[in-house]
Design a protein with these regions (language model features):
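Residues forming the flavin
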Residues: 3-53, 57-184, 188-530
Length: 530
């Protein structure tokens, strides 16, 4: 096939214009095209007020080399179709079924691959099925009554279920895992456009249905799910995993235990540390969730002409400060909501979430400051966890259990806000005005303020006085890394640390890909379970 890149078209182009552009770029006729597939679609707004839609497409034709040479198009190349392949099965035999702990993206894709290959995985998830979990989350947002086992962090689908459902990743994977993840989501009900959009997203509403469909297929392939089943202990003999304990009362023997815990399984981290599993603190970032009117972000990113024609605009900002810290946007949610993402009593964390239509009137993003083990006395593997907890306890107290909020101008002046400015907050969960100064160290607070002013150089009025900040954004990534070797095993053999909670991914797609890598390691070593 021939891949043609840099196909620029007007924002409001027709399908006929799209085909004509391809025909002209390769100097071919319509009937010569046997098959066509969009590889990438993005918005180019670098030369506002002119904005273009830019495509890369794969075109299947006869006599590819001849057509390519005749076209003289420097943006066209012959490429081979790349399909993901599962490795050959190993020779060792299982005595017991492989266990996967956690049904987030890493655990689900690990289980899916194992199930497809006949390994009959047994998945334990501390939370509930996605439909019941959603009911618990909505109840929490309405009443403030938290279920510590079923919330924004815990339950089928993982923390990403209540986010924007972003699927972009910076991970380059020559083996095609990234495309496999996207194609799998599409096969279970996600829109096909996620396979080619530059910044694909599903949205919480659709992702929930996709996750449930994926679970049903894993069950059909011989896998098993046990919900409301928290791993409370493990049995180790001769530095090998022998069994896992569920809910303090049931032991399940296994030789393979995939730890796809998620970044908020703090009690499980504590339990694992006591067993001698090697883990270490890692750098992460903390800050606030910041809201602006989406129409203003659209105008800044697209220009006045296209601000209302195009989809809700995303942004990405970053600054490296003189004090050595980085300040940057994270998990930006166009047309999104700030949500109460707490999972522990008397502690409060926030996150951002969008539905598939990104229809909220506000844009929000975490604006976060980098922290290292030096900031939280990182001598103990779980020191980052305790750092997070202290911040979340402060945030809970500041809002009396509600999301504490403040206008950016008041934050700079170190005074409590008493009302919104020209726009109000879009949240899921109750809110309360507070003074968020004192939540972080002086240096980190000044870094946040300096970063906000710096970003205003790129996005006008990013540092507007009535920008709404909500605290605390503390769960940006895992504060822990569970060490693993080149075959993905921990120092306790048979344990496979996996995904974001183990410190090897950041976001839905990279976590899913890491789940696949761990499944591949198990497949290379063992025969399917019989």
């Amino acid at each position: 096939m021939i891949r043609v890149s840099q196909l620029k078209l007007p924002v409001e182009h027709s399908e006929e214009q799209f085909y004509q552009k391809i025909e002209k770029s390769l100097k071919i006729k319509r009937d010569q095209i046997k098959k066509l597939q969009i590889v990438k679609k993005s918005i180019d707004a670098r030369k506002k007020p002119e904005v273009s839609i830019v495509y890369s497409v794969d075109v299947w034709v006869d006599k590819e080399e001849k057509i390519l040479k005749h076209s003289g198009n420097k943006n066209a190349v012959c490429v081979k179709e790349k399909k993901y392949k599962v490795p050959e099965h190993g020779t060792e035999r299982f005595n017991h079924r492989p266990v996967v702990i956690g049904a987030g993206p890493a655990g689900l894709f690990c289980a899916y691959l194992l199930a497809r290959e006949g390994y009959r995985p047994l998945v334990f998830e501390r939370g509930k099925k996605v439909v019941e979990r959603t009911e618990d989350v909505l109840h929490f947002w309405k009443t403030g009554v938290l279920n510590p086992a079923s919330n924004v962090q815990f339950g089928e689908g993982g923390a990403g279920t209540f986010s924007d459902g972003k699927l972009n990743t910076l991970v380059k994977d020559p083996l095609g895992r990234n495309r496999f993840v996207l194609d799998t989501f599409v096969s279970f009900g996600a829109p096909e456009k996620i396979t080619y959009e530059n910044k694909p997203h599903i949205g919480t509403d659709i992702l929930s249905k996709v996750i449930a469909a994926m679970r049903e297929e894993i069950l059909h392939l011989g896998g098993t799910f046990e919900f409301e089943s928290c791993v409370t202990d493990i049995r180790v003999e001769n530095q090998k995993i022998k069994a896992v304990e569920i809910n303090h009362n049931t032991w399940m023997e296994t030789e393979v235990c995939v730890l796809a815990l998620g970044h908020s399984a703090r009690d499980t981290f504590e339990m694992l540390q006591k067993t001698g599993l090697f883990m270490e603190p890692k750098a992460f970032a903390v800050g606030f969730r910041v809201e602006h009117p989406q129409k203003d972000i659209n105008r800044s990113q697209y220009g006045e002409k296209y601000a209302e024609l195009l989809e809700a605009a995303p942004y990405k900002v970053t600054a490296n400060l003189a004090n050595g810290r980085g300040v940057y946007s994270f998990c930006m949610c166009p047309g999104g909501y700030v949500v109460n993402a707490s999972s522990e009593e008397k502690r409060l964390a926030v996150n951002g979430m969008s539905y598939s239509d990104r229809g909220s009137k506000n844009a929000n993003s975490a604006i976060i400051v980098s922290v290292t083990p030096d900031d939280f006395d990182g001598t103990d593997a779980l020191s980052g966890v305790e750092f997070q907890r202290r911040l979340e306890e402060k945030a809970f107290a500041l809002g009396n259990g509600k999301i504490p909020q403040q206008l950016f101008g008041d934050y700079c002046e170190n005074k409590k806000s008493t009302g919104y400015g020209t726009f109000s907050s879009e949240t899921r969960g109750e809110t309360a005005f507070s003074n968020l100064r004192g939540l972080f160290s002086d240096e980190m607070e000044q870094s946040f303020i300096e970063g906000m002013h710096s970003f205003a150089k790129h996005i006008p009025e990013f540092d507007r006085k009535d920008a709404i900040i909500s605290g605390v954004e503390s769960r940006t990534s895992s504060p822990v890394r569970i060490r693993r070797d080149e075959v993905f095993e921990a120092n306790i053999r048979g344990i496979y640390p996996c995904g974001e909670g183990a410190g090897y991914a950041g976001g839905i797609t990279s976590a899913a890909m890491d789940g696949m890598k761990v499944a591949e390691a198990v497949i290379r070593k063992y025969q399917p379970f019989k």
